[in-house]
Amino acid sequence: MSSYPNTKIYNTLPKILRHRAETIPNTVALRDKDLGIWNEITWKHYNDQVSYLALSLVKRGFKTGDVIGLIGDNKPSWLFFELAAQAVGGMSLGIYRDTLDEEVGYLIDAAKVNFVYAEDQEQVDKILTINRPKGNKINIYYEDSRGLKELEDPNITDMLDLISEGKEIASKHPDKYNKMIDKVSADQEAILCTTSGTTSNPKLAMLPGGKFIEHVLRYLKVDPKNINDEYVSVLPFPWIMEQTYGVGFNIVGGMKVNFPERPDTAMDDLREVGPTFMLGAPRLWEQIAADMRSRILDAPKITQWLFNVMVERGLKAVDQGKRDFLADKLLFSSLKDRLGFSKVTSAATGGSAIGPETFKFFLAMGIPLRQLYGQTELMGAYTLQDVPEGTMDCETVGVPFPDCEIKIIDPDPNGLGEIITKHPSMFSGYYNNPKAYKETIKKGWMHTGDAGYFDDQGRLNVLDRVNDIAIKSDGVKFSPQNIENKLKFSPYVGEAVVIGAEKPYLTAIICIRFSIVSKLAEKWQLAFTSYTGLAADKKIYALIEEEISKVNEQLPDNIKIAKFLLLFKELEADDGELTRTKKVRRSVINSRYKDIIKDLYLDKDTASIDTEFTLEDGRKSKISATMEIRHLIDTKTSKTTKAKSKANKSSKGKK
């Protein structure tokens, strides 16, 4: 802890930033890749940019308590504006860059935003669609000037002009910025962070700057970071965990943050950096694992055989809390090097549950991946796995951080109940929504809505949302998410929705991982022109059937998947089926695809849908499709169907 700034003195992020600029001015704080070149940003330059923007924003009317909206890719400019707002005593509201126009408008209006950093023309255009009363214009600041330079709008300004303006103010009033940030207290709300929004529109959690710092320090006690650590920022800044690492661990811990040139170059750029720490949501880890397994499809058969044998050896060793020397020598060490993970000493996954097979795969590779658990309202994670050498834990999210308390309320006979929690650095409320705060915080405890239990070692196991824990018609409880995560370990399964609440058996709606399945289809010389056509192909059905059968072998007889179908489209956040953090909105799926779900529980071989629904942006969409229902288990006898073995044979050896 002694290497971290004294937060009793430096109790806001801008104050800590200034302290670093004064004590280690020429040390690299950030790197940003542009046109193939990594540009280094020192602590002094970082602090200068923030101070110039803050002074300019004040001149333009930004004041204590105001909110600045931020939308774009992860870039240093985002951080400059975020810290500038906090320097004034204002708040930042991060918006996911793929958010639709109408969603952007909802968030901007909900937070009463009058100032916005929009990275480029695409994001500026979204802000311009927001209708505001005459004379109440939104001030927009951009970084990428392409397509914007010729605009003659006094409310749209290049951020370079703000920096120049602020620099001039600083030259005339050298103490103005320091006096400004010294007035801002630790209790001042600094960040507006959106909740996940799985059941409704996201709420805006208000995070005081001082409490955010307190919790970052709490985290650093269990997972220390310093100026020698390297991190690549690939997850969106609006997510609380990227705020923790990309902002908190950077400024408070000193960890260097590297920004890829573009989202689609992130993995290549990561290899160049060689990070010491990696954070990924489960979907990222699933995609990396799937990509590695798919690449082997193009390799000679002997290489494919070696890959599969070594992976199996590695996974068996992990189950015993060990590493397999031969598998590491022949496979995993080269995989780590190819991914850019050779220097990783700490890695984490959070945001939702990760499938145990995916988790074990990275442990077998030698990546010290650990699960964490938390909520936006509690400043992010407050548990982290601590796995002693020679043991293995792929089920729990570990134990609470110091000063964090967790209880299970209303437990069933097996100890499963709702998780409630509290710690000293919680959020101060939901912006302009006191009713929601009272519903969430009761007697100081946050009711998470998650279902979990403690194991005999006091480790927390999170199963699913309380409302999503399902009970079959025979009274058997199961977690759809747990089964879905097992399915998504397959490189061919992009998304899965398991159904079975109040039903006699389980079924699944599957979305294929098009990027990988299409590659396999080309190898098999299958004719297709679209996702829909490929998802209807019988050979692809046979492929997915084989993958589901592997998962069924791991499941108890009373919760095996009896039937499945391949959905004619991918689930999309823009269609309201996923959140912006890619979590399934089950209520939307159950409503939109109710006809399909009904057919899955009838004695039918096809499911049909013919309906119209409203998209997130208000547009109407008409759906008309018929899909094959594949039977894995005879629902009358509970025996595996003969069709399965035939299908599996037909899928093997196809070229």
Q: Whereabouts are the PLM-identified features?
A:
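Conserved pre-ATP/AMP-binding loop-to-beta segment of ANL
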Residues: P25-V28, T157, S164-T194, N201, ...
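Conserved AMP-binding/adenylate-forming core of the ANL superfamily
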Residues: L30-L83, L100-G105, D158-I163, L207-G210
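Conserved AMP-binding A3 loop
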Residues: E40-K44, D182, A190-E214
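Conserved structural elements of the adenylate-forming
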Residues: N47, S51-Y52, A186, A205-N226, ...
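Conserved ATP-dependent adenylate/AMP-binding module captured primarily in the ANL superfamily
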Residues: T99-T129, I213-V232, P263-F277, R338
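Conserved AMP-binding/adenylation subdomain of ANL enzymes
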Residues: I213-E230, F237-F332, K343, P368
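Conserved ATP-binding/catalytic segment of the ANL
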Residues: K407, N414-K472
